[in-house]
């Protein structure tokens, strides 16, 4: 079933789905962002960033065209060939193994199409399931950031994790 997941560019028609994700406090706490964004604000952001080469945003569809989640590469730096990775799986689709498939698809795109050198992410220390998943996908801890983000009324530590193109491309050899 995971093989039937498709990454495609975020389109204006997907904004209602994104709006629902962005207004879920639990989801946004994992992205270290403020929830409860207005739809007008989201549309403005979409219009502002639609042609921004420093970002790639994808929605995830299953074979029936149901929206499953969102995958983003942001802060793309074409000199240093690096980008930050972010992922959201809609709550009703979590726990089905989709994240692992989508992480690998995003890494494949990053390293074989964009020819990036390094992909990094930030994950809450208090989210051991996500840390473990990222480690299984080849990410390595690069640093521990103390009280980096203010979420749910308190500051939280995060791990910065990374994977290099060479490690990803040589993983099966």
Swiss-Prot record:
> Mainly localized where?
cytoplasm
**Annotated EC:** 2.3.1.57
Catalysed reaction per UniProt? an alkane-alpha,omega-diamine + acetyl-CoA = an N-acetylalkane-alpha,omega-diamine + CoA + H(+); spermidine + acetyl-CoA = N(1)-acetylspermidine + CoA + H(+); spermidine + acetyl-CoA = N(8)-acetylspermidine + CoA + H(+); spermine + acetyl-CoA = N(1)-acetylspermine + CoA + H(+)
Q: Which segments cross the bilayer?
A: none
Reported regulation of activity: Allosterically regulated by polyamines. Polyamines trigger conformational changes and induce the symmetric closed dodecameric state of the protein when they bind to their allosteric sites.
User: Any idea which positions bind acetyl-CoA?
Assistant: 87-89, 94-100, 127-136
Answer whether the UniProt record assigns the keyword Cell wall biogenesis/degradation to this protein: no
The enzyme's first-digit EC class, named in words, is: transferase
- GO cellular component terms listed in the entry, alphabetical order: cytoplasm
Q: Which InterPro entries match?
A: Acyl_CoA_acyltransferase, GNAT_dom
Pinpoint the N-acetyltransferase domain residues: 5-162
Q: Where is the active site?
A: 134
What GO biological process terms are annotated to this protein in UniProt? Answer: polyamine catabolic process; spermidine catabolic process; spermine catabolic process
Site residues, Could be important for selectivity toward long polyamines: 84
Localisation: Cytoplasm
Write out the GO MF terms: diamine N-acetyltransferase activity; magnesium ion binding
Query: Its pathway?
Result: Amine and polyamine degradation; spermidine degradation; Amine and polyamine degradation; spermine degradation
**Which residues of this UniProt protein bind spermidine?**
33, 41
Function field: Involved in the protection against polyamine toxicity by regulating their concentration. Catalyzes the transfer of an acetyl group from acetyl coenzyme A (AcCoA) to the primary amino groups of spermidine to yield N(1)- and N(8)-acetylspermidine. It can use polyamines such as spermine and N(1)-acetylspermine, but not putrescine or cadaverine.
On assembly, the entry states:
Homododecamer; dimer of hexamers. Exists in solution in a variety of protein homooligomeric states including dodecamers in an open state. The presence of the polyamines spermidine or spermine shifts the equilibrium to dodecamers and induces the formation of the closed, symmetric dodecamers.
Q: NCBIfam families attached here? A: PRK15130.1
Report the sequence similarity comment from the record.
Belongs to the acetyltransferase family.
* Protein name per the record: Spermidine N(1)-acetyltransferase
**Protein source organism:** Vibrio cholerae serotype O1 (strain ATCC 39315 / El Tor Inaba N16961)
**Protein's gene:** speG
